[in-house]
Amino acid sequence: MSAKDVKFGDSARSKMIAGVNVLADAVKVTLGPKGRNVVIDRSFGAPHITKDGVTVAKEITLKDKFENMGAQLVREVSSKTNDIAGDGTTTATVLAQAILNEGIKSVTAGMNPMDLKRGIDIAVRAVVENIRATAKPADDFKAIEQVGSISANSDETVGKLIAQAMEKVGKEGVITVEEGSGFEDALDVVEGMQFDRGYISPYFANKQDTLTAELENPFILLVDKKISNIRELITTLEAVAKTGKPLLIIAEDVEGEALATLVVNNMRGIIKVCAVKAPGFGDRRKAMLQDIAILTGATVISEEVGMSLEQASLQDLGTAHKITVSKENTVIVDGAGDANAIAERVQQIRAQIEESTSEYDKEKLQERVAKLAGGVAVIKIGAATEVEMKEKKDRVDDALHATRAAVEEGVVAGGGVALVRAVNSLDGLTGANDDQTVGINILRRAIEAPLRQIVSNAGDEPSVVINAVKAGEGNYGYNAATGVYGDMLEMGILDPAKVTRSALEHAASVAGLMLTTEAMITDIPEDKPAMPDMGGMGGMGGMM
């Protein structure tokens, strides 16, 4: 076990703060509409240019191990805020630095760090309640567009794309961001339920130009097993053929004699049919078959519940307005399932999301909610170069998360104004002792830091702007992009309440832990002896 280097008290804290300041100073230049870019070197390929705070934070590792500990703790602030709210990473870093730098003065003056932390926590609770109380719901197209534009660093086209996507697939729909192939941004929307399984045989395709099978008002048969014997399907096929409607079979697999007979009947026009493998594997396949059943009003034919395929009737089949099956995907549009049953199923899956601890499981469950509730939208990013593409994708991802947060908890005045206004909630607030009251005042001063940084990045004087904003009321603030004072909501400068709240909570949490740190321990690097020179070979000197 290697020897340890241990530092105590002020010498430990001063090293930690030095690391915090290096990371925070690199991150905070990106804040606001006039925030600057940060260029990150890559070991291969072109440098990465970004205005995304968490991307900058993740790249920083310091040589001094004590300073690096401070930097990594603040990096944790931006990562946590990013995970929960999807944006506000730079704001969180600026707040953490401000709380720490204000607090360390009091610790150095001999105040009790634990009481200071308790005071900060009391103040944070009051400010968070104020933010929640002043938040306005973001349920209209314009508000969503404005939040998206601001989070994408004032890029209005991105805001419009996200608002259009949310309008098309609903607030529960899945919206993904991909790299496009052209110069322009584009939006692709798949309405209805889509899953990644195509037709089992290309002979099921009835549109030869697109190689797809299009079924209008079809019946849907769901089977939780492999089908290889055509005798099992005869009853169902005869019943469907009499109606003259097409049939989609979704099963674990269709093979052998059953597949050959279906293909022949389809090609001869006796019955229009298409067979598709069920999506997913194992328990997830069973769950997705049940989702499709509820969406289309079908019953899953499963031997586990004592049902046999030979006895299936038209009552067990589901229906939909239209189904399109390609080589790789199946899209079910406007399933005839009961709306209440679908809503109950969505609630049930949401409850599973709350209980799940795996990020992968949560993502898959969220996809199932989207497929039942709305649809899937894909925003395709266009750019001239790969470097620009990556930078833009970072911004669009941020904007997408921010708009989701806005829909969830509403919006507040942007540009750091909501935090400055929340200072009023600290008036008359005192702690159990003088040191706790000092902790409350630490947050009172630190809470102005985001607005100061936005103004500073815009090249204006922070103190002048802070005083002017404090003199106003409500949503009155400063538009750093234009240099104009006015109502922030009317000017379209909004922040999701969830982002502002998360940034403050995480910043105060980590800054409080740092203030109460009294010792730091790290490994002492071992001096490894240099490799000896290689011995000389016959007729040669020693190689160096």
Curated annotation (Swiss-Prot):
PROSITE patterns linked: CHAPERONINS_CPN60
The reaction(s) this protein catalyses: ATP + H2O + a folded polypeptide = ADP + phosphate + an unfolded polypeptide
Disulfides per UniProt: none
Known partners and oligomeric status: Forms a cylinder of 14 subunits composed of two heptameric rings stacked back-to-back. Interacts with the co-chaperonin GroES.
Location in the cell: Cytoplasm
An example Gene Ontology molecular-function term: unfolded protein binding
GO cellular component: cytoplasm
CDD domains: GroEL
Protein name: Chaperonin GroEL
Record function comment: Together with its co-chaperonin GroES, plays an essential role in assisting protein folding. The GroEL-GroES system forms a nano-cage that allows encapsulation of the non-native substrate proteins and provides a physical environment optimized to promote and accelerate protein folding.
Sites where the protein binds ATP: 30-33, 51, 87-91, 415, 479-481, 495
Family: Belongs to the chaperonin (HSP60) family.
Native source species: Acinetobacter baylyi (strain ATCC 33305 / BD413 / ADP1)
PANTHER family: 60 KDA HEAT SHOCK PROTEIN, MITOCHONDRIAL (PTHR45633)
Enzyme Commission number: 5.6.1.7
A biological process from GO: protein refolding
Superkingdom of origin organism: Bacteria
UniProtKB keywords: ATP-binding, Chaperone, Cytoplasm, Isomerase, Nucleotide-binding
Cleaved signal peptide residues: none
Top class in the EC scheme: isomerase
